[in-house]
Amino acid sequence: VTHIENDATFKNGIDIHDKVTLTFANGATAYFECAIDDLQNKRSGKIIGTKGSIEMDYFYRPTSATVNYEGESQSVTRELDGDDFYSEIAAVHHGISYINYEAKRMSHQDTIDEVSLLERIHEVTYGK
């Protein structure tokens, strides 16, 4: 990520609505919004590309999505087993059982990179 912008709304010194744009070295951009001031938000997610988009209900645990590709649309629905943290709990259990110190799906470096990006967004937001 070469550039970060955040059009944040603050209340009592706390960011309550963030509109973050990330710019990458190749010129591609990513945008996301997160808020605690919008009770009507359905917590939906959209991924928009040059040839189409994916729209989903609850972005953090979608059970349905609509894929729009070059003018065609297809919907997919899937039931999920367990609660919101089932896969995380299963991964920890597997790691303990088999003495794995790092998950295959997300390495320690992935975690460090993610935290680093969040810290950079925080610096842009709060100027610290």
Predicted regions and their residues:
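Contiguous beta-strand/loop segments that form the cofactor/metal-binding neighborhood of enzyme cores
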Residues: 1-61, 90-99
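Tryptophan-centric aromatic hotspots in well-structured domains and transmembrane helices
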Residues: 59-60, 85-87, 121-122
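Active-site loop of classical SDR/Rossmann-like NAD(P)-dependent oxidoreductases
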Residues: 56, 77-90, 106
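C-terminal helix-rich "cap/oligomerization" subdomain common to oxidoreductases
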Residues: 25, 91-128
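Short polybasic amphipathic segments
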Residues: 45, 62-71
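Detector for glycine-centered tight turns/loop "hinges" at secondary-structure junctions
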Residues: 27, 71-72
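Loop/helix-junction capping segments adjacent to catalytic residues or to phosphate/diphosphate-binding pockets
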Residues: 14, 41, 86, 105, ...
